[in-house]
């Protein structure tokens, strides 16, 4: 039988148990930090030469020169033709739905003119070049290409550079096909911290980017953290999470499989069921034990459920909402009768899946909203990846003579108060005598 925590929100010591459940070690440690810093320094100083060495060492792929790291566009198109029609159709439908959704996120420039003629506004522009990291090998995820590339392209980013490791020369056709569909401009066979370094600093072959996005292992996550400041990054993602709040009226098999959909990602993933119905909680537990045996990732799921899973019984809806907002889950399912009525009370969640028919997996692939979401309680202060992550804002100010006269007097007084005489003088030069 699966050994999952069964908790009552009213029990003594519940808060301590909850904190232990949610605790997650940082994405890095001293050993990883040292390795990553060495890789970053090496790539920054030696460029393509270092990339070729690391590719041979870690991916067992020997290439003669830097230009061999690039996968030609013709290969992307060939991969698109090679994959089965149902996969191609699925990728294209997913890309279109993600595009349709993200087009509604585009920020627009705006401005207004005050009575004295002073012009104020905000100009929105896109990033020039973005780097997309995609995990490679047999565990490659073409959905990651779609979710990261489409918002960048919708934002208007003119150049999107993708890096994907190809261990032993193994290329994942679905990943390359997704890159072709999404309009990725250049693809390099690079992985690990060295790929992040190449994107951040540039080499003779790989152009430097303005922002690095995309998931990766502990070395990739640590490298992204290290290069932040030189370039922007999307986020440092922790293990995948799902919290299902159910009123007891949904098929327990559905809920069990929804919990497994995140647990199968890796052994550190977290799956939590919150319900007011203790009998239903037990039904879900029985379903979990029945269904886990049917899945090829049974071992991973069992470890994740044992180490970080929980079934939590609450007294009422208000207690459930308080718990949800405290946990701030990456994925939240509201498997209840009137989920929309609960929305005003839900403050912290990466994505909210409403109703009994909305499996979280639909959001992972093709619903439309982005599947790159804040984890480890960071939904308290951060948001899903979107078009706005590939746009930036510039403030616009143009003073009329009359406006400069009025504002100059105010700025002069404030600058004097801060002891900044050059500021005060600069403002007052524009003041009429």
From Swiss-Prot:
Endpoints of the signal sequence: none
Cited SUPFAM superfamilies: ALDH-like (SSF53720)
Gene Ontology biological process terms in this record: L-histidine biosynthetic process
Binding note for cofactor: Binds 1 zinc ion per subunit.
Cofactors required: Zn(2+)
Binding residues for substrate: 240, 262, 265, 331, 364, 418, 423
Keywords in alphabetical order: Amino-acid biosynthesis, Histidine biosynthesis, Metal-binding, NAD, Oxidoreductase, Zinc
Protein EC: 1.1.1.23
Pathway per the UniProt entry: Amino-acid biosynthesis; L-histidine biosynthesis; L-histidine from 5-phospho-alpha-D-ribose 1-diphosphate: step 9/9
Positions annotated as active site in the UniProt record: 330 (proton acceptor), 331 (proton acceptor)
Binding residues for NAD(+): 133, 194, 217
Gene3D superfamilies: 1.20.5.1300, Nitrogenase molybdenum iron protein domain
Gene Ontology MF term list: histidinol dehydrogenase activity; NAD binding; zinc ion binding
Reactions listed under catalytic activity: L-histidinol + 2 NAD(+) + H2O = L-histidine + 2 NADH + 3 H(+)
Pfam family, one: Histidinol_dh
Top-rank EC class of the record's enzyme: oxidoreductase
Binding of Zn(2+), residues: 262, 265, 364, 423
Gene Ontology CC terms: cytosol
Domain of life, source organism: Bacteria
Cited function: Catalyzes the sequential NAD-dependent oxidations of L-histidinol to L-histidinaldehyde and then to L-histidine.
Sequence similarity: Belongs to the histidinol dehydrogenase family.
Matching PANTHER family: HISTIDINE BIOSYNTHESIS TRIFUNCTIONAL PROTEIN, HISTIDINOL DEHYDROGENASE HDH
Name of this chain's protein: Histidinol dehydrogenase
High-level lineage: Bacteria, Pseudomonadati, Pseudomonadota, Gammaproteobacteria, Thiotrichales
Gene symbol of the encoding locus: hisD
